[in-house]
Regions:
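Post-Walker A helix-loop "phosphate-sensing" segment adjacent to the P-loop in P-loop NTPases
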Residues: 1-10
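A short acidic-Thr-Gly-centered motif at the start of a beta-strand
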Residues: 2, 74-78
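Conserved nucleotide-sensing/catalytic segment adjacent to the nucleotide-binding pocket
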Residues: 9-11, 18-68, 82
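Short gly/ser/thr-rich secondary-structure transition/capping motifs
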Residues: 63-71, 155-158
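Short loop/turn elements that form and flank the Walker-type P-loop nucleotide-binding site
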Residues: 77-79, 101-102
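Structural recognition of the conserved hydrophobic beta-strand(s) that form the central parallel beta-sheet
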Residues: 82-86, 107-108
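Short beta->alpha connector loops
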Residues: 88-91
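Conserved NTP phosphate-binding and transfer environment spanning the P-loop NTPase/kinase superfamily
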Residues: 93-235
Length: 235
């Protein structure tokens, strides 16, 4: 949007996590990072209301290394512009119900592309591509190894069905975020990582991406959406 002259900023709901010691619990006693209550809901509502009314807000920053909100905030000034709110619960009406309807455009972003071999059989599921994205992002930016991400993955998929697909019919637009080349990127990264507690799942994932030629991440354009998962070239 910026390249088209539209003033824009991204507001990630991940920055609104309540933090270590305050997360709701799953039935097995583990922290539940996926439910909407894992976010500071009143603070999300306040920031969105401020943006809708004035175009300006001071939003939190979450430190994934300490698993706590950072002491500093981020000043977002998008007066006469667009704020892209991204996150698992961005469609949840509990966050946006107090906003003017004409202030919100819901875009459902998901992977739609499938990959098949010469015999027509599916080589890899879209959820495997999403898992590879998340493993790479968590490893590079959130201080988590592959074991942590794979162990959490069944709960993530359950949360997707419960919290995203439930509100999919609220979408004004559907955006396919697939990149035909990205399977080669994940082959490049997944081949570097190991998992001990989830070695079998990691081996299965690696075997699926082994069908594709690795692509060096340096070849990905700096403005590509894939940089969300792999970072800038110099990171």
């Amino acid at each position: 949007m910026r390249s088209k002259g539209v003033r824009s900023r991204v507001l990630s709901l991940d920055d609104f996590f309540v933090g270590e010691g305050r997360y709701p619990k799953q039935p097995d006693g583990r922290d539940d990072y996926e439910c909407v209550e894992a976010l500071d809901i009143p603070l999300v509502q306040h920031c969105l209301q401020q943006l809708a009314q004035t175009g300006v807000c001071d939003a939190p920053i979450f430190d994934f290394m300490t698993q706590l909100p950072a002491p500093q905030t981020q000043h977002i000034d998008c007066t006469d512009g667009v704020v892209v709110v991204e996150g698992l619960h961005a469609f949840n009406p509990i966050l946006t119900e107090t906003l003017p309807q004409d202030a919100v455009l819901n875009i459902y972003a998901s992977l739609r592309e499938e990959y098949a071999g010469p015999d027509g059989a599916r080589l890899i599921a879209t959820r495997d591509v999403r898992l590879a994205r998340r493993i790479t992002r968590d490893w590079r930016f959130r201080g988590h190894d592959a074991d942590f991400t794979i162990g959490l993955w069944p709960h993530v998929c359950k949360a997707e069905d419960q919290y995203i697909k439930t509100f999919k019919n609220r979408a004004n637009l559907v955006l396919d975020t697939s990149f035909s080349c990205e399977v080669g990127i994940w082959e490049y990264y997944i081949d570097q990582l190991t998992a001990s507690a989830n070695a079998g799942r990691m081996a299965d994932l690696r075997s699926r991406f082994a069908h594709f030629v690795p692509i060096n991440a340096a070849l990905i354009p700096q403005k590509s959406m894939l940089r969300e998962f792999i970072g800038a070239e110099n990171q």
